[in-house]
Amino acid sequence: MKIIVTGCKGQLGTEIIKQLREGRSEIGPIPEKLMNATVIPVDLPELDISNYKMVDDFIRRQRPDVIINCAAYTNVDGCEVNHDAAFKANALGPRNLAQAAEKTGARLVHVSTDYVFSGRENGGIAQDEATIPGPISAYGSTKLMGEKYVEQFCHRHRSEEHTSELQ
């Protein structure tokens, strides 16, 4: 099995790669079929996920079974002033990965954020699949666009995960 992890230099990408390579996580063992996976960590400048041609070429060349997208523009305040950069990383990037995954048959695991929710439901506590998104920041809005693109372009093999605060 071959797994590409985008955003490998970030906090989440670094931890996912570590756990895949060690074969264990804080919540339990890694599934056996992932134990001996070839893990391909990738980040800027090697792969700019906002560049469709670069993504398409890279994914076709690598032929992964799984793509775990941890890449994002995560500076919440920065997203308010750098709309273009936020849109490229958080919306176009996931779209490009979704299209490439769909073309090659790879499974896409797209990591999003609880910022796609307003925090006003349930007293701002638990969000679940039934919670209606309602971002209140540019960061949340661009991450929600990325989720929508993944849903639109990756029909066969996708999984979306929301993270909260990372420690």
Task: Report residues per predicted region.
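SDR active-site strand-loop-helix element
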Residues: T6, V42, I67-A71, L108-T113, ...
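Structural signature of beta-strand start/N-cap positions in the alpha/beta core
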Residues: K2, T38, R63-D65, R107, ...
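Catalytic helix-loop patch of NAD(P)-dependent Rossmann-fold dehydrogenases
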Residues: K88, L92-N96, K103, R107, ...
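N-terminal Rossmann NAD(P)H-binding glycine-rich loop of SDR-like oxidoreductase domains
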Residues: M1-E26
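Rossmann-fold cofactor-recognition segment
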Residues: T38-K53
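Conserved small/polar residues in nucleotide/adenosyl-binding loops
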Residues: E161-Q167
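NAD(P)H-binding glycine-rich loop region in Rossmannoid oxidoreductase-like domains
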Residues: I49-A89, A100
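Intrinsically disordered, low-complexity Ser/Thr- and acidic-rich flexible linkers and loops
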Residues: R24-N36
